[in-house]
Amino acid sequence: MKIGVIGGGQLGRMLALAGTPLGMNFAFLDPAPDACAAALGEHLRADYGDQDHLRQLADEVDLVTFEFESVPAETVAFLSQFVPVYPSAEALRIARDRWFEKSMFKDLGIPTPAFVDIQSQADLDAAVASIGLPAVLKTRTLGYDGKGQKVLRKPEDVVGTFAELGSVSCLLEGFVPFTGEVSLIAVRARDGETKFYPLVHNTHDSGILKLSVASTDHPLQALAEDYSSRVLKQLDYVGVMAFEFFEVDGGLKANEIAPRVHNSGHWTTEGAECSQFENHLRAVAGLPLGSTAKVGESAMLNFIGVVPPVEKVIAIEDCHLHHYGKAFKAGRKVGHANLRCADMATLQAQIVKVEALIAE
């Protein structure tokens, strides 16, 4: 089976690494000349809206998926005329736009921060008067890793902020005084079978994920699965989806969804019976889903800007290095380390060792 992937970054790369043992081949459509997934399959270098190359991709593969939600929904809709695409264009349309996403949460009875659509500075001023401060202004699309948003803490922060974010459609969200950030990785098959990985505790730095630690018997696991199931059924979803939640007053508020494999699920490569990458491929290919059970105690630490010396990383016991083969650049995810240990005490000790390497 040949899989087409829109995007040739590290997520596409890890999909290919998971799919190759299953006998799958890959083709990546990505405009970047140095797409890091290209070493693992055919690379069609073209813009995501290039219909000639999209048609070429459709003719060459058995199905198409995508590695990030910034791909235009029109691209997926076009491809869907010629080849199966999972997740669907409708799922992408909703997940890539924060207004549609939050409105869906509200319609499904899933708690989420108060939100208001913003189309002008006047809209922003009125929304701030209604929601109050602090609040967070976010672009409706194309925001990731802390980009496309600004926290508004005092009245002076509001002045000119709409223009600062590009005078594009935005969303103002009420600030949530959360006690923690967690995410749930779910996978849904073509026949509706759904499985969930354990909730993950996430730590961010300047909006970029720094550390994910898989939980054991989290008290909010069932609630997270309930909320996530509502979304998956509503979208008739196929593939892996990530759900990000705020922990608030002993419950959960939905922050956002990602219709793809996700950074907070990277630990599953060594830390689960079947990784999120393999399970995504199983789902979209119509194969039986694999077990999402944890193996030991696991965590993932991102390498931002630079990967520490390989010999130092792999010298840490229970540590597994994933180097993306990307050029080092400030603020860029260029690799990660997965830790899988026998117990939580050992895991915490090994996390400290990797963090020390990152700080060098």
Q: Language-model segments: which ranges?
A:
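ATP-binding N-terminal substructure of ATP-dependent carboxylate-amine bond-forming enzymes
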Residues: M1-F100, D107, A122
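Active-site nucleotide/adenylate-binding loops and adjacent lid/helix of ATP-dependent enzymes
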Residues: I94-S183, V187-Q234, E355
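A short linear hydrophobic-aromatic micro-motif
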Residues: A114, P134-V136, S169-E173, M241-A242, ...
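Short, low-complexity Ser/Thr-rich regulatory SLiMs
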Residues: A186-R190, F245-D249, G325
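Active-site "cap" helix and flanking loop/linker of ATP-utilizing ligase/carboxylase catalytic domains
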Residues: A222-F243, V248-D249, A258-V306
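Peripheral (often C-terminal) accessory segments that flank ATP-dependent C-N-forming ligase machineries
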Residues: R282-E360
